[in-house]
Each structure stands twice: as structure tokens, then as C-alpha cells.
């Protein structure tokens, strides 16, 4: 289950938030964020809510992005997990299971939520974007994947005061993943090692 959650969001990667003009719509803010952000690091908290209303699964950690294509999504609590994208491959490491899953980046990201943040600026190629009104003090944009096999019905991104503060993922099984970002740094210098991964000795490597 924990591995499935990480694979769904992949990176769901994340970002540093860009101050924008207050009158800009949420879609415009998303485009401006992508245009002006090359690297980002932040902390996140995440809750996965099932369709049957069971207690949400909570987790927290850190993210780093270097656009295009590189990301690092590290869950620290309650169970360590790591997703690293080096631009060519996506590595998913579960220390408790001693397992590493590796996939080609293009196949893994495609129309996934990770593509919204770590990909190039050509969002309309993979997503239909629209302003989705205001709620919880944020202006929202809905991103609906054009591919029918993305595994997601839509992704929502929330802006507050011109900053991108939230991300919500609605999957095909009725689960909702809510992500909130804090301590965001936009365009920091990130060491190259941030986006490199070598499977630890003894780990079971599955995939490409």
C-alpha cells in the first residue's frame, strides 16, 4: 500500500512557490510558476483519504525539483520512502521492504501529477486546464489528464496570495491525496547528487 501511494504521486514532486499578481487567475499563476521556476525545494504534509472514509494515511517529508525532468520526493514520517528522478529514470526505494523499483522517466511521468511540476511548459499537450473557483482561502486550477490510462481523474492545484500552496490528486479508485507545502525555496542551488540514486547493496531491484 505504501509503495502504491508513492508510485501514484511519483513526485508528485513539488515545488517552490512563486509570488504573482493578485489578479492573475489560477491557470495563469500555474503557467507563470512553471515559466519562472527552474529549481525548488520544500517540505510537504500529505493525507490519503479512501472512498470508504477510513482514517486518512498521514505522511510528511521533503521535495526538490530541477526542471525539466529531475525530482526528489522523500517521505520521512511515518515510514521512510524515496522517489528520485534523474531525467532518464525514476527510482522508488522502500527501505523497509529492501526493494527498488525503476522505470523509464517518460513512461513513469507522462500524464502523471509529476509532469505538472517537473516537466516542460507544454501542459496543454497532456492536460486540460481550467480555473476551478475558490475554496479554503485558495484559488484552484483543475488539470484533467488527456490520456485515459493515467490512473487519475484530475489533479487540483491551489494558490493563495499568489503562491502555490496545495495539490490534490483524485485517482480512478476513489482515493483523494491531499498535499500541502511549506518552507518553500524557489530557484535554490541544488547539488547534482540530489537527483542521483544508486540502489543499496542487497536491495531487490525491480523494473527497467
Swiss-Prot record:
Residues 1-24 form the signal peptide. InterPro entries: LolA/LolB/LppX, OM_lipoprot_carrier_LolA-like, OM_lipoprot_carrier_LolA_Pbac. GO terms for biological process: lipoprotein localization to outer membrane; lipoprotein transport. It is found in: Periplasm. GO terms for cellular component: periplasmic space. SUPFAM superfamilies: Prokaryotic lipoproteins and lipoprotein localization factors. This is Outer-membrane lipoprotein carrier protein. The gene is lolA.
Amino acid at each position: 500500500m505504501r509503495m502504491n501511494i508513492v508510485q501514484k504521486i511519483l513526485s508528485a514532486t513539488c515545488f517552490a512557490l512563486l509570488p504573482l499578481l493578485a489578479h492573475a487567475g489560477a491557470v495563469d499563476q500555474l503557467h507563470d510558476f512553471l515559466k519562472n521556476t527552474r529549481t525548488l525545494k520544500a517540505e510537504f504534509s500529505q493525507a490519503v483519504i479512501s472512498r470508504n472514509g477510513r482514517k486518512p494515511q498521514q505522511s510528511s517529508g521533503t521535495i526538490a525539483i530541477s526542471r525539466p525532468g529531475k525530482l526528489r520526493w522523500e517521505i520521512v514520517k511515518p515510514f521512510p520512502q524515496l522517489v528520485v528522478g534523474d531525467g532518464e529514470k525514476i527510482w522508488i526505494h522502500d527501505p523497509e521492504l529492501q526493494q527498488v523499483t525503476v522505470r523509464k522517466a517518460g513512461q513513469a511521468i507522462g500524464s502523471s501529477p509529476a509532469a505538472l511540476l517537473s516537466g516542460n511548459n507544454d501542459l496543454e499537450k497532456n492536460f486540460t486546464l481550467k480555473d476551478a473557483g475558490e475554496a479554503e482561502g485558495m484559488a484552484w486550477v483543475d488539470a484533467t489528464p488527456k490520456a485515459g490510462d493515467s490512473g487519475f481523474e484530475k489533479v487540483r492545484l491551489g494558490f493563495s496570495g499568489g503562491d502555490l500552496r496545495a495539490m490534490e490528486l483524485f485517482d480512478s479508485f476513489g482515493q483523494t491525496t491531499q498535499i500541502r507545502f511549506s518552507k518553500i525555496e524557489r530557484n535554490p542551488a541544488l547539488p547534482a547528487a540530489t537527483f542521483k540514486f544508486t540502489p543499496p547493496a542487497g536491495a531487490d531491484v525491480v523494473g527497467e
